[in-house]
Amino acid sequence: MQQAGLTLMAVAVCVAFQTSEAILPMASSCCTEVSHHVSGRLLERVSSCSIQRADGDCDLAAVILHVKRRRICISPHNRTLKQWMRASEVKKNGRENVCSGKKQPSRKDRKGHTTRKHRTRGTHRHEASR
């Protein structure tokens, strides 16, 4: 009788633990706010950076700058940040992305085919035939 009560108590504790995990998910390291301003002086002190996508676990797109022991979340649309990332790419021998993170998804049309931007050099086809 006492063993059955102990087993029942253990099962109840396990169930309670499982439901509390579902209600209160583990804390993640997502940015919840982004700054829309960043100084050039701050960018000089960046040791590394990473990209947070607005899919999956995190709801906000951000570039996370690591400065000393701090994480600073910046809007990925910030003009100064974009210029710094382009300049850093050149310094890093043309690496695709200075910050680690997921690559941008390819553009797809309604049928799921990957689309590319068409670049035309010189005149257009219909003008050349005239």
Curated annotation (Swiss-Prot):
InterPro entries for the chain: Chemokine_IL8-like_dom, Interleukin_8-like_sf
Superkingdom, taxonomy of origin: Eukaryota
Signal peptide span: 1-16
Keyword Glycoprotein annotated: yes
Expression sites (tissue/organ): Mainly expressed in testis, epithelial cells of normal colon, kidney, Peyer patches, lymph nodes. Also found in lower levels in brain, spleen and lung.
Keywords recorded for this protein, A-Z: Chemotaxis, Cytokine, Disulfide bond, Glycoprotein, Secreted, Signal
GO CC annotations on file: extracellular space
Segments of this protein annotated with the region Disordered: 92-130
Disulfide pairings: 30-58, 31-73
Annotated localization: Secreted
Compositional bias per record (Basic residues), positions renumbered to this chain: 104-124
The keyword Zinc appears for this protein: no
Gene Ontology molecular function terms on file: chemokine activity
Protein family per UniProt: Belongs to the intercrine beta (chemokine CC) family.
Function statement: Chemotactic for resting CD4, CD8 T-cells and eosinophils. Binds to CCR10 and induces calcium mobilization in a dose-dependent manner.
Name recorded for this polypeptide: C-C motif chemokine 28
Organism: Mus musculus
